[in-house]
């Protein structure tokens, strides 16, 4: 019942946003919102326990990014790397999370970690291309090297936990790696936003950590 309520609530918010977008004349947003709502329902009621589950969940994350970007008039050219990269990352996290019950196998954990690393590389490549194209105001001030260092630190913190889970594939280690990878989604999003939109919008994204941390008191993120 709680899962059903959460699904109805999330789809309801998506629908409300889609209606607002239609009223404003943004039909592309409606199409993306419909795709996102469908992906959420497909994952929870059909794909969650199947081999396609990680792909569908990754698609949900990619469409989530795409929804916001479409509402802002994008994506254009290299901006497609953002939903692609974070979608790949979340697909890897979902695949890794499937191994958390009992003693896990190293091969699936290793493959999942490689998928996560690939997603992080794709997302980071967007910023490299952005800088090559003239960059944003923030990149002009801070420099690409500083952003890449920040991204590398965050990516390493995620992947290190995952590697620890591979080295000792016990339930507790895998669960900690998954929890860290999920919580890092918000931080990674914020750093990507920082590169293109600056500190103000990055801070707005980081504030999403507050409800996330509070919700962990009620239920495990995994």
Where are the model-predicted features located?
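Intramembrane alpha-helical segments
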Residues: 2-100
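C-terminal membrane-associated helical module and adjoining short loops/tails
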Residues: 24, 59-222
């Amino acid at each position: 019942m709680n899962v059903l309520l959460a699904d109805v609530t999330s789809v309801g918010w998506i629908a409300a946003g889609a209606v607002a977008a239609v009223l404003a004349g943004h039909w592309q947003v409606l199409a993306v919102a419909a795709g996102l709502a469908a992906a959420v329902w497909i994952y929870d009621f059909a794909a969650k326990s199947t081999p396609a589950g990680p792909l569908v969940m990754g698609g949900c994350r990619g469409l989530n990014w795409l929804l916001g970007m479409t509402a802002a008039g994008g994506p254009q050219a290299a901006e497609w790397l953002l939903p692609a990269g974070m979608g790949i990352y979340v697909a890897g996290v979902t695949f890794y999370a499937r191994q958390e019950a009992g003693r896990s196998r190293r091969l699936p954990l290793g493959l999942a970690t490689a998928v996560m690393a690939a997603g992080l590389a794709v997302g980071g490549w967007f910023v490299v291309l952005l800088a090559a194209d003239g960059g944003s105001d923030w990149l002009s001030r801070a420099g690409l090297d500083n952003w890449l260092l920040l991204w590398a630190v965050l990516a390493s913190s995620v992947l290190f936990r995952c590697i620890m889970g591979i080295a000792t594939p016990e339930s507790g280690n895998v669960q900690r790696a998954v929890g860290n990878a999920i919580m890092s989604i918000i931080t990674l999003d914020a750093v990507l936003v920082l590169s293109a939109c600056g500190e103000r919008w990055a801070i707005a994204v980081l504030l999403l950590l507050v409800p996330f941390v509070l919700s962990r008191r009620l239920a495990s993120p995994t």
